[in-house]
Structure formats: structure tokens, C-alpha cells
Amino acid sequence: MTRDELKTTKIGVLMGGLSAEREVSLASGGAVLKALQSRGYDAVPVDVGRDLPQVLVREWIDVAFICLHGRYGEDGTVQGLLELMGIPYTGSGVLASALAMNKIVAKEVFAARGLTIAPYRVVRRGETVDPVAEGFGYPVVVKPSQEGSSVGVSIVKSPEELPSALELAFRYDDDILVERFIKGREIQIGILDDRAMGAIEIVPVNEFYDFEAKYTAGKAEHICPPVLPAELHRRLLAEGEAAHRALGCSGYSRVDFLVTEGGECYLLEVNTLPGMTALSLLPEIALKESGIGFEDLVERILISAELKIKGEGAGS
């Protein structure tokens, strides 16, 4: 949609939601809402609950700017509802959102496309796992299949720590991942209009870039752009775009990597609805690597809003 067309519409900023990342979503949505209103758009907040269809109709929402994180927002469910209601929306479509949210399926897609991922084992509720027997050894990373912002994630350094880590992860999902721990630098790639904008390195104060480090000032250092050999920097940008394409993402995303001392790049995940808070990484990459300020970034994402399902009957 064009800027002029969007100025005549009512934009609902979808935020909050039902996931464990509700508070982060409210922060992202609040920042986006302020940016849109400052640019003269008729934008209103929509706190997403199970009455979302009724709210969208009652508020006469024409376009949805999705600022949801986690389940029931980042996983294709809301995207499917918007497709059914014929409301154009920002970000990736139903399938790409669902694939990216499910770390197990996403890893299978990445591996099929030749992208490097850490060795892993899927553990389902009621099963046990021995990292030594799997060839991983310790430490390992234990994480739920379908949560974001490091919710339910643990770094396990010994057999004694494994049961509590599994118990924590199973609070959030019936399927979890046990991955070989890769020691390396955390590099994240920002994607806008399906092209890599640049990279950022995260150096957490503590050992692990956890939920607190992601959303608390002073808990992590951001280095943008990261200090990398030129060839490695180019490779990360290219692999970031490749991961975005592999899942069929559209518009924007953030792609997370671990880079070892030897220059190996391990793809961790693709975030189809990255945070848009004051401490979020995508806005920082946009500004420092591409000279795109926050309001411009929000507007460019808005302009990309569309229905992804094409064909007869779509959006009618």
C-alpha cells in the first residue's frame, strides 16, 4: 500500500496478547503507535485477546501493524485470522510465521537448504535424553520449541542440572530441543524489505543473553556494526537473507547467529516479529547500519502491509 492510501485508513497496532512475552509486546506496540501517530496516521492500540475478531470489526480496523511476540501472535494464528477477515497486515504470512516459531521444523528447513545449525535432539514429554550418549557432551542448551525472548531456555553444564532444565522447558512446550552448546559471538542480522540492512553483536554482561539481558538497560553491550573480517560480514548478511527466504518470510525479520573463533556461522533462528522497543536490536541496526530512524523504519514496515494469500476469494 502507498503512504497516501494508508493515510486514509484506520491502523490497528496489535499488541499485548496471550503469550509469555506480553509485556515486551506492549512495549513494542506502544513505541510503534507513538511513531505512527507522530507521522499523522490514524493509529489506535488493540490489546489482543480472544475477542480480537469482534474488536477489529467494532473499531473498523483497515490495516493491522502486528507487534505481538510469542504464541498466538508470532506463530501464524493471528495472521490466519487477518487473512480470513481480509485485513492487510505487516510482517510474514501464516506459513512463514508458523515455521519460524517452531524451532524444530525451522531447523529441518535450514538443514535442507544447506545452512549450518548446531547438532540437536528433540525430546518429547515423558522421554529422557543423555547428552553424552548423543555425542554432545556438556554444556548443552535446553529450550522449548515454540517460545521466544529466551523464555524457558537453560544452559546445562552437568548431568545434575539437566532435570530442572527439562522441567522448566516443559512448562512451555511438549516438545523441546537439546542442542550442543556452541561457544561463539552472538551476531544478529536485520532484514528490511527482504534485504539485509546490517549486523549487530550482543555481548551480555552475564554468561547468557537471557530475557533480563534483552530487556534491561545495561545488561548487554551492543556493538553495531560488529568488528568482523569483511568476507565474514558479507557471508553473514547473505546467510541472513537465505534464512529469511528459506522460511518464506516477507517484509522484515531478524536472523540470529553464533560465530565461532574459526569463523563458522551457526544459524540459531529467524524472528519474524522482532522487538521494536527502545532496547530492541532491529531499530538499532536500521539506524547505525542503514541510517534509517525509528519513525522511518516503522513507516517502511507499514507500507509493506498486505494480504499474503492470493487468488479467487482471498480477502473477500
From Swiss-Prot:
InterPro entries (alphabetical): ATP-grasp, ATP_grasp_subdomain_1, D-Ala_lig_Van_CS, D_ala_D_ala, Dala_Dala_lig_C, Dala_Dala_lig_N, PreATP-grasp_dom_sf
Localisation: Cytoplasm
Entry binding sites for Mg(2+) 1: D256, E269
Pathway(s) annotated for this protein in UniProt: Cell wall biogenesis; peptidoglycan biosynthesis
Reaction catalysis annotation: 2 D-alanine + ATP = D-alanyl-D-alanine + ADP + phosphate + H(+)
Function description: Cell wall formation.
Species the sequence originates in: Geobacter sulfurreducens (strain ATCC 51573 / DSM 12127 / PCA)
Biological processes, Gene Ontology terms: cell wall organization; peptidoglycan biosynthetic process; regulation of cell shape
Gene Ontology CC: one annotated term: cytoplasm
ATP-grasp domain span: 107-303
PROSITE patterns: ATP_GRASP (PS50975), DALA_DALA_LIGASE_1 (PS00843), DALA_DALA_LIGASE_2 (PS00844)
Binding positions (Mg(2+) 2): E269, N271
Cofactor(s) of this protein: Mg(2+); Mn(2+)
Enzyme class: ligase
Protein name per Swiss-Prot or TrEMBL: D-alanine--D-alanine ligase
Binding site for ATP: 133-188
Cofactor binding note of this UniProt entry: Binds 2 magnesium or manganese ions per subunit.
Protein EC: 6.3.2.4
Keywords: ATP-binding, Cell shape, Cell wall biogenesis/degradation, Cytoplasm, Ligase, Magnesium, Manganese, Metal-binding, Nucleotide-binding, Peptidoglycan synthesis
Family per similarity comment: Belongs to the D-alanine--D-alanine ligase family.
GO molecular function, one term: ATP binding
